[in-house]
Amino acid sequence: MDGGVGIQVLPGGEHAVAVHRGPLERLPTVYVEIMGTWLPSRGRETGRGSPYEIYRTNPETSPADQQIIEVRVPLA
């Protein structure tokens, strides 16, 4: 894995956090909900850094309908 691993500093502070339970194919709807509905309805904006995901289950070994993924979006 030539050059495929590195170090990244994640921003601290507040994050919007949503937990997705279900197939990976539905994960984009979580981003639509956070960015298109949740943030604007609360007068919040994204902060520095990119949104990221924490996979609480292994997508390769867990059934599709039992996936658990946290989506975290840094807030300004």
Predicted regions: what they are:
Residues 1-76:
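A solvent-exposed interaction/effector surface
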